[in-house]
Each structure stands twice: as structure tokens, then as C-alpha cells.
Amino acid sequence: PSHKDDYAKLNKEWHAKEDQLESKIKETSAKTENLPYAATESVAWYLADDLKMTDATPKGYAQASANESEPTPADIKDFQDTLKAGPIKMLVFNSQEANSTTDQITGAAKDANVPIVELTEQMPKQYTNLLDWMSALVDQFAAAVK
């Protein structure tokens, strides 16, 4: 191809950023390994798994979220009580799906001094590529466990 050198350069830059991200994930996972977290949605599950975290989202709430249905009042209360009890060390909140239920959950997290990592399903406009966005998300997770 006529732009072979350009493509090779871009590929090399991409792989360098990818290696940096993998190193950052490995470094951060030393702090987050086995850390119990809960999530208003499973949007960050793969990243949390890469960070070796433990999903402690109460089962009823998690099932309702996975089925794209509303959690029952008992599920919401269980989530709030679990946040207050202390085993959850981080709440992951999908701000694109904010509603009165997630307001109750994030409110309980704030009351219990549980750090909240806010993220979205779509890459925010301030990022020009996936690797920069993912790197910023890893930074947010790392900052939440300091």
C-alpha cells in the first residue's frame, strides 16, 4: 500500500499504548486484587475482572440488572444495607443509566463513605481513542482505593 510506513508507525504507536495500559492494569491490580466492589450495572465487569476485583453486588439486584428489569424494593434495601455494613469497598456507577434507584444506591454509598467510580457505556468526547479512555478508567479505580 502507498501508506505502508504510516500504517506501520500508527500500529507501533498503538501497541506501545496498549503495553502501557497493560502495565498500568497490572500495577493497579496489585492494589485492587480481591477487593470487593458492587456495581449499578455490569458495564465495568471486564475491567474489574482484569483488576482482579471481586464482584460483591447483591445477587437480587445483580440479577435484575442483568435482566434489564427493575430491582425489587427488597433488592434495593439489601444493596443499601450491604453498603452500610462495610464489605463493599467501591461502587461502580454507570452515569448513563442514572435513575431514582441508582440515586438511592449512590446515596447509600456516599453515606457509608464507599468510593464511587463513575463511568459510562460510551467513550466520552474528551478521549480520542479507546486506550486513553481505558487508561483514565484504570486511574479512577486506582484513585478510589487510595
Q: Which stretches of residues belong to each language-model region?
A:
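Extracytoplasmic metal-acquisition and chelation regions
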Residues: P1-K146
